[in-house]
Structure formats: structure tokens, C-alpha cells
């Protein structure tokens, strides 16, 4: 199980993980690591929250919010943000399903993808700033948001089909069991509830899960399934929705 954790941490972050710590795991086994997603989010969000706490006394709330969101993007190598941009480029192209999927595979950034990145990153910075001004404990809020975003992404994996024939998302989409889904969601709810001291965390998590479930159904109807890009989009939007629900 520890090998699986390190493999997942290396897969969805840019944190330096020695390859020997996950040695012997096949890529096809990665679907079992979905239950680790909330804990990985907890680590990444915790680092982002620490950066906010350290910088706030020195440069103020707005710049601390900017740098903690920048750190979060760097910690993931922009992996999920790239998925968000590709998803928006495809969905908002208003083309046929097959053409949408082709556009999503194009490495070039389109207008819709660029606008989505600007909106989501700016919204995160503004929401983090507002939460801090309201006295919200930012270490807990950011850690919980990242755990919620990654945990809720399982809703786009369970009983969904992969919209393409190949790709990174194929290791998760349609391969996750009901038991793994329940454990992943349960862990995300527990993390949010513990960090945010009870009902606020639980209510915020319910809002996030409902929004991501609806997003998954809309993407399924539009694309005929999910891709690695839509998983990245769900994680980014899940984080933002969680933070917004805390306001």
C-alpha cells in the first residue's frame, strides 16, 4: 500500500519521489491508488497553506494568496490546469463529439482554454483573499479544498466510460469499483469535516460533490464519456467550488 501511495504522489504531483519507493508497480495497478487521492490533496494543499501563512505577514493577504495558488500550480506541474484548458477548448468549440475530442488532444492553447485558466486562477486568488479577510484558517481551508477536489474526481471514474481508445485517464475511468469510490469519498468527507471542525466542512463537501456529479453527467452527455483532461478539470473546479462554498 505504501508503494501505491508514493506512485500516486509521483503521478499527480511534481514532488520529488525516489523511483525505488514505487518500484515493482505496474501502471495498470494505479486504479487501486484512487483511495490515496484525498491524502495527496491534503499534502499539496497543506504546502500551499503553509506558504500563505508564511508570506501573509510579510507581503499581505492578496500577494500571499497569489503565491499560494502559484505554488499549488507548480506542485502539480500544471497537470490539472492543462486538463481544464483542454476540456474547455473542446467543449466550447461547439463541434461534433469526435472533433471536440480531437481539439482536446491538441497541445495548443485555444481562446476558451485561456479564458478558463484566467477565470479559475483569478477566482481562486480572490476567494482565498476573501476567506482570509473573514478570518478563515487558511491552512485548513486549502488542505481541505485540495483533498475535496481530488476525492470528488472519483465521481467521473465510477461507472463512466473512457471517451477515447487510449490515454492516461484510461487507467482510472471505468476501472474504479464501488467500494473504492465509497472509500475515496468517505476519506475526503472525513478530511474536510475534521479540518473545518464539523458541519461547515460536511456541508461544503456536499455542495462540492453535488456540483462535480452534475459536471460529470454533463461531460458524459457531451463527450460520450470522460478523459484524463476532464478529470483534471473536475479537480480544479472541485477545489474552486469547495472554497466558494466556504464563503
Swiss-Prot record:
InterPro entries: CobS (IPR003805). GO terms for biological process: cobalamin biosynthetic process. Belongs to the CobS family. The chain crosses the membrane at residues 34-54, 59-79, 113-133, 138-158, 194-214. It is a multi-pass membrane protein. Joins adenosylcobinamide-GDP and alpha-ribazole to generate adenosylcobalamin (Ado-cobalamin). Also synthesizes adenosylcobalamin 5'-phosphate from adenosylcobinamide-GDP and alpha-ribazole 5'-phosphate. Its EC number is 2.7.8.26. It catalyses: alpha-ribazole + adenosylcob(III)inamide-GDP = adenosylcob(III)alamin + GMP + H(+); alpha-ribazole 5'-phosphate + adenosylcob(III)inamide-GDP = adenosylcob(III)alamin 5'-phosphate + GMP + H(+). Keywords: Cell inner membrane, Cell membrane, Cobalamin biosynthesis, Magnesium, Membrane, Transferase, Transmembrane, Transmembrane helix. This is Adenosylcobinamide-GDP ribazoletransferase. It is found in: Cell inner membrane. It comes from Salmonella typhi. Pathway: Cofactor biosynthesis; adenosylcobalamin biosynthesis; adenosylcobalamin from cob(II)yrinate a,c-diamide: step 7/7. Its cofactor is Mg(2+). GO terms for molecular function: adenosylcobinamide-GDP ribazoletransferase activity; cobalamin 5'-phosphate synthase activity. One of its GO terms (cellular component) is plasma membrane. Its main location: membrane.
